[in-house]
Regions:
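Acidic (Asp/Glu)-rich catalytic clusters
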Residues: 18-19, 68-78, 105-110, 167-170, ...
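N-terminal binding-site loop/beta-alpha segment at the start of enzyme catalytic domains
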Residues: 2-81, 136, 140, 208, ...
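Short, acidic/polar
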Residues: 35-47, 93-108, 161-164, 185-186
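CE4/NodB-like, metal-dependent polysaccharide N-deacetylase domain
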Residues: 97-118, 143-147
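A short, structured active-site edge motif that brings together acidic residues
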Residues: 78-91, 115-121, 181
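Beta/alpha (TIM)-barrel catalytic core signal, keyed to glycine-rich beta->alpha loops juxtaposed to Asp/Glu
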Residues: 36, 122-290
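Active-site mouth loops of central-metabolism enzymes
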Residues: 27-38, 87-94, 125-130
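Residues at the N-termini of beta-strands
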Residues: 54, 112-115, 152, 176
Length: 290
């Protein structure tokens, strides 16, 4: 995605285009660490009512059923929402992926997903055979994509070595790589390679799990532009060409987090924010313990 200030200022209509031509709303609502239950359903419903049309969940979050309840409660036609979920680590491999995807559809109460991602490339259960497991998983995802049950397919937390291995057997290239991206944590080389391979970059934890908001420089930028520190971070993410996935259960902050289409940061400030020392370090997917 290449961001330009001339893009639509209406947060409800601002979309990016994936490599297959599918439109994806430029800001999503993240649901990591939101447990299954009425609280999560209420938060997702509030986000939809605030204007979000892109909801990001995962089987590993354990909240797909609550997300589905919120989608139905919203009363919006399914086609007006962009729903993403992700394959859980124990379910890699062709047959397991097919079964897991169908469970996700059932939990969400939908007959298709807009985007389905491999959540992690190297789960501990497949450490000695991750390449083969990912190849089988991807074959299953390609089949669902061709059947129209997934509108776009991609990956999350994949480094270049994982992408290269996947592309050796893939017939359809990933359209998205969802990564931990925030001020001071830009993963430049990985982002460059992902873009060269045609992938849009989604940013999870775009506020650095909150630590970025406490950096003194962010307060200065917030004052300069008359915005909250979170809005500065999210606008920065857009101008970096990332698609941010902020999370908040607070209705006021939910609304603020999508009010980022009516101002721009200077090129100098974008570069300076990217270079901030915010203490962020990407997790190595080859050493995860799950």
């Amino acid at each position: 995605m290449e961001w330009t200030p001339a893009m639509e200022h209406n947060s409800l209509s601002a979309c990016c285009t994936l490599s297959n031509g599918a439109a994806i709303p430029c800001v999503g609502y993240g649901t990591w660490q939101m447990p299954d239950g009425s609280g999560t359903a209420d938060a997702v419903l509030a986000a939809i009512r605030a204007g979000y049309r892109h909801i990001d969940t995962a089987a590993a979050y354990g909240n797909e059923r609550s997300v589905g309840n919120a989608i139905r409660a919203s009363g919006l036609p399914r086609e007006e929402l962009f729903i993403t979920s992700k394959l859980a680590n124990p379910d890699h491999g062709y047959e397991a992926t097919r079964a897991a995807f169908l469970r996700t559809l059932d939990s969400l109460g939908t007959d298709y997903l807009d985007l389905y991602l491999i959540h992690w490339p190297n789960p501990i259960a497949f450490r000695d055979q991750w390449k083969q497991a990912n190849a089988g998983t991807w074959r299953a995802m390609e089949e669902f994509y061709r059947e129209g049950r997934i509108r776009a397919i991609g990956v999350s937390n994949f480094c270049q070595r994982h992408l290269e291995a996947l592309l050796e057997s893939a017939q359809i290239a990933p359209m998205v790589n969802q990564l931990s991206l925030s001020p001071g944590l830009t993963q430049d080389e990985l982002c460059r390679y992902s873009r060269e391979m045609g992938m849009l970059l989604e940013a999870y934890s775009p506020l650095g799990t909150g630590r970025v908001l406490n950096v003194p420089e962010m307060a200065a930028y917030a004052e300069k532009y008359g915005r909250s520190a979170a809005q500065i971070c999210l606008r920065w993410s857009l101008q970096m060409g990332f698609l941010p996935l902020p999370k908040s259960a607070d209705p006021t902050r939910m609304a603020q987090n999508i009010q980022i289409f009516d101002f721009s940061l200077s090129d100098e400030d974008v570069a300076a924010i990217a270079a901030l020392d915010c203490g962020g370090v990407p997790r190595d997917p080859d050493t995860t313990t799950f």
